Curated annotation (Swiss-Prot):
<feature type="binding site">
    <location>
        <position position="180"/>
    </location>
    <ligand>
        <name>NAD(+)</name>
    </ligand>
</feature>
<keyword id="KW-0067">ATP-binding</keyword>
<keyword id="KW-0547">Nucleotide-binding</keyword>
<dbReference type="GO" id="GO:0005524">
    <property type="term" value="F:ATP binding"/>
</dbReference>
<dbReference type="GO" id="GO:0003951">
    <property type="term" value="F:NAD+ kinase activity"/>
</dbReference>
<comment type="function">
    <text>Involved in the regulation of the intracellular balance of NAD and NADP, and is a key enzyme in the biosynthesis of NADP. Catalyzes specifically the phosphorylation on 2'-hydroxyl of the adenosine moiety of NAD to yield NADP.</text>
</comment>
<feature type="binding site">
    <location>
        <begin position="67"/>
        <end position="68"/>
    </location>
    <ligand>
        <name>NAD(+)</name>
    </ligand>
</feature>
<dbReference type="GO" id="GO:0051287">
    <property type="term" value="F:NAD binding"/>
</dbReference>
<dbReference type="InterPro" id="IPR017438">
    <property type="entry name" value="ATP-NAD_kinase_N"/>
</dbReference>
<keyword id="KW-0963">Cytoplasm</keyword>
<feature type="binding site">
    <location>
        <position position="72"/>
    </location>
    <ligand>
        <name>NAD(+)</name>
    </ligand>
</feature>
<keyword id="KW-0808">Transferase</keyword>
<feature type="binding site">
    <location>
        <begin position="148"/>
        <end position="149"/>
    </location>
    <ligand>
        <name>NAD(+)</name>
    </ligand>
</feature>
<dbReference type="GO" id="GO:0019674">
    <property type="term" value="P:NAD metabolic process"/>
</dbReference>
<dbReference type="InterPro" id="IPR002504">
    <property type="entry name" value="NADK"/>
</dbReference>
<dbReference type="GO" id="GO:0046872">
    <property type="term" value="F:metal ion binding"/>
</dbReference>
<dbReference type="GO" id="GO:0005737">
    <property type="term" value="C:cytoplasm"/>
</dbReference>
């Protein structure tokens, strides 16, 4: 890959990420590659300024932080078709990031120049918040995109976490979940909040949506995996509080009133993630990040 301009985005609350961004800038400069550096607490207009008020659009974005930093950048940049290289600087699990050694030993430049990487396109979800009206044309109030997940929780979570949510899949009313909330996840997001709530781990190459209730009051309410070509409708049930709160990739979006509904489906623009061929594969990542031990009986057996 020939690089002319790189957008560097670093985790705003991390001094380590700030220093790493300066180091990255110097490495690129030594190769005569221009770069723009911004913190992850950017506003949307700042991104547009970096993309449109320059002569050239960035060839790639380099994200320095953890998965949380990457998720914000992914949702801001995916619509512009810019591949993202995420390097784990100060993050925790880091399922979406490369190891920091690639940055500090400067090997990331060689890998990019020699094209020793793949571009992994990850599907996102789109959520349209609409007003429930009898009109044949839906009225969209707000639209959001998510790489990991959307989830719905009580508006009074600290006082009364329980809510009741109705779900329809492809125009079929499927269930009413009563509990602490509901997660709609991509395959990529299956190792995030959904996994913590007892959902299945789904390989990111599988085009799927995971519907996972959070602490449901019925044992019959189980996670289900559906094709990501499905259309999912979420509505708050009147007989509960009549309102629920919508979250996206760990960030609060808005309150869904009893006269609203959410239409969730596959997003239009995928997120393009640069993955180095030298980095560990998906299963090794699971073993490392989740501290899996493998077959302990084999380790204890005598030959």
């Amino acid at each position: 890959m020939k690089l002319s301009l790189v957008l560097i985005i670093y985790r705003s609350d991390s001094s380590i990420a700030l220093e790493a961004s300066k180091f990255c800038e110097e490495v690129l400069k030594a190769k005569n590659i221009k770069s723009n550096r911004i913190a992850s607490d950017f506003h949307r207009d700042e991104i547009e300024k970096n993309l449109y008020n320059t002569k050239f659009q960035p060839d790639i974005g380099i994200v320095l932080g953890g998965d949380g930093t990457f998720l914000k950048c992914a949702n801001a940049l995916a619509d512009y078709d810019i591949p993202l290289l995420s390097i784990n600087i100060g993050g925790n699990l880091g399922f979406l990031t490369q190891e920091k050694d690639f940055l500090f030993d400067k090997s990331f430049i060689e890998i990019l120049e020699n094209e020793e990487y793949i571009i992994d396109s990850r599907n996102r979800l789109n959520c349209n918040v609409c007003i429930s009206e009898r009109s044949p044309e839906k009225k969209i109030i707000k639209s959001y995109d998510a790489l990991n997940d959307f989830y719905f929780k009580s508006v009074e979570e600290a006082i009364s976490p329980t809510n009741q949510i109705q779900i329809e899949i492809d125009n079929e009313k499927v269930n009413e979940y009563k509990g602490d909330g509901l997660i709609i996840s991509t395959s990529t997001g299956s190792t995030a909040y959904s996994m913590a709530a007892g959902g299945p781990i789904v390989h990111p190459s599988i085009d799927a949506m995971i519907i996972n209730p959070i602490c449901p009051m019925s044992l019959a309410s189980r996670p289900i995996v559906i094709p990501n070509t499905s259309k999912v409708i979420i509505k708050p049930v009147k007989k509960s509080k009549g309102e629920i709160k919508l979250w996206r990739d760990g960030s609060k979006c808005m309150t869904i009133k009893e006269t609203y509904y959410c239409e969730i489906k596959k997003g239009k623009a995928p997120c393009k993630i640069i993955k180095f061929k030298k980095s560990t594969n998906y299963y090794n990542t699971l073993i490392k990040k989740l501290d899996w031990k493998g077959d302990l009986s084999l380790k204890n057996s005598k030959n």
